[in-house]
Amino acid sequence: MKEHELGKARRIAELAAMHRRGQDIIGRLPVEDIRIQYHEDLSPLGWHLGHCAFIETYWLREIVLGDNATTATLHGVYFPDLCEKAARPEFVLGRDQLLEWTGAVHSENLALLADPPAHMRQHRLMRADYLLDFLVQHYAQHLEIMHYVLAQRELRISGPWTPGRTLTPANPLGEALRLPRQPVMIGCDAPCAYDNEQPRHAFRRRGKYIAQYPVTNAEYLAFMENDGYRHRELWSRVGWAWLDNTRVDCPALWRRAEHSWYELSAAGPRDLKPDAAVRGVCFYEAEAFSRWAGARLPHEFEWEAAARAGLLQGLGQVWEWCANRFHPYPGFRPFPYEGYSTPWFDDRHGVLRGGSEHTLPPVRRTSFRNFYTLDKRHICAGLRLAWD
Ligand code: AVJ
Ligand code: FE
């Protein structure tokens, strides 16, 4: 077997593993729960699995092979811009039917990928197994989002719980790392990288320091107990308006117990570890916290420069809000479709770097840019401080 073939076998196995994870999540839930919309920004769990199977089939059959027999009637259900979130529950198949349908189209797709006809191999999307990487990463991102849905479901169904430990506040340590002085290359040219990670370009530091660790639960509690949610001067104008509207006073999954706090997760209630990264805060809260701590959020390039120098610790617990908006790199070219990144370069989306406990290896890389609007709290997001 040639090296290239080995790569392909591994990628096919990865795709199959992603699909199995999705099936497992659906398979162990009560029948009714897969069609519930638990949060206005999230889709029903059943929709996610159907969408992943649809997207896989759409790219392989409709785009590469020009055969729309399976997908033609499903565009209005599974293309996000053709079916608003609130309408999705009514389209979710019954659990067994969903498992059977997604299982069947997925097996057919795997067989096609394992032994593609000659004209399929020539397609530009098949070069360097691009489409396989793309589909694996697509599944990986939806699987993470399915965990956000599971956490919202816990918020809905779980009763009172007694934490095993008391969370006590701690002042932010502010252990700072010096950002590299010399220019650092930002982005990734690997074939698997998304359009928004390219092209690579040099960045020279502006600020000087970035925190070694993300902000912790204990530090965030200090902000709360110091009336961080009530001090207007810590908030930007839009941030304050957002707060006034939502009346938020703690991270999204935190719950108050008699003498302390705990948090809900995709796997149920759990203690808030004092040194674990705080999760479930939006950009505005991250911004207010950093002002309270006498710091600021890092620009995404500061974050990436520090991550490339191997400096950052505590990675992979939460997505970390960056100071800047999501924007195209100089020389950006959209691929494999206009809609992946371009619509979100709208000055309303912030950038998140790093990755959470639910982020799977195919999308865990230093150059990966996640993006959400500034008010989102259902994602597993926290922050890391920076200083000039
Ligand atoms: C990059 C996570 C914001 O969920 O909308 C999934 C990823 N794009 N299917 C999203 C995505 C198309 C995207 N995020
Ligand atoms: Fe998608």
Task: Describe these PLM feature segments.
Residues 56, 304, 328-329:
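Hydrophobic positions within alpha-helical membrane elements
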Residues 189, 302-303, 321-326:
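Histidine- and/or cysteine-centered catalytic micro-motif in compact active-site loops
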Residues 197-201, 227-248, 314-388:
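Surface-exposed recognition segments
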Residues 300-305, 367:
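Short, structured beta-strand/loop micro-motifs enriched in basic residues and often containing a Trp
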Residues 306-315:
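Cytochrome P450 C-terminal beta-domain/meander region
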